Amino acid sequence: MSLTVRVIAADKTVWDSAAEEVILPSTTGQLGILSGHAPLLSALDVGVMRVRPGKDWVSIALMGGFVEVENDEVVILVNGAERGDTIDREEARSTLSAAQARLDQSEQSEDKQERYEAQRDFKRARARLQASGEVVNI
């Protein structure tokens, strides 16, 4: 038995297919979902979702949102999402490097909003690079 998985962003449906397993970045840690999972509603953090439609895994960068699981249906509503196989790694590396520099600079700032935005941008850039298949150690 398999799951029906849908990843829906405001501007597009990123994934709509059957899957055997899903791993999501919840706000309290990684969340694994298999067929027969108990009903669930959970907040999602910025991070990488992994979905296994067969024997291979597909990575999707999620920009935060919510997941609802019920009767082997997994509906993921997100602020933004991007499949890892569509991400330009060079561009993602460059974006992460710039986000890291901005984060380092913001740590000296008194402006809480600036620090928050720098942290958010860093997490998003890191998730995109990880979803592309690159190992990120920062």
UniProtKB/Swiss-Prot annotation:
Keyword Ion transport applies: yes
Region Disordered, annotated ranges: 88-119
GO MF term list: ATP binding; proton-transporting ATP synthase activity, rotational mechanism
Subcellular location field: Cellular thylakoid membrane
Keyword terms: ATP synthesis, CF(1), Hydrogen ion transport, Ion transport, Membrane, Thylakoid, Transport
The protein, known as: ATP synthase epsilon chain
Membrane topology according to the record: Peripheral membrane protein
PANTHER family: ATP SYNTHASE DELTA/EPSILON CHAIN (PTHR13822), ATP SYNTHASE EPSILON CHAIN, CHLOROPLASTIC (PTHR13822:SF10)
Family: Belongs to the ATPase epsilon chain family.
Keyword Membrane: yes
Species, as recorded: Acaryochloris marina (strain MBIC 11017)
Compositional bias per record (Basic and acidic residues), positions renumbered to this chain: 109-119
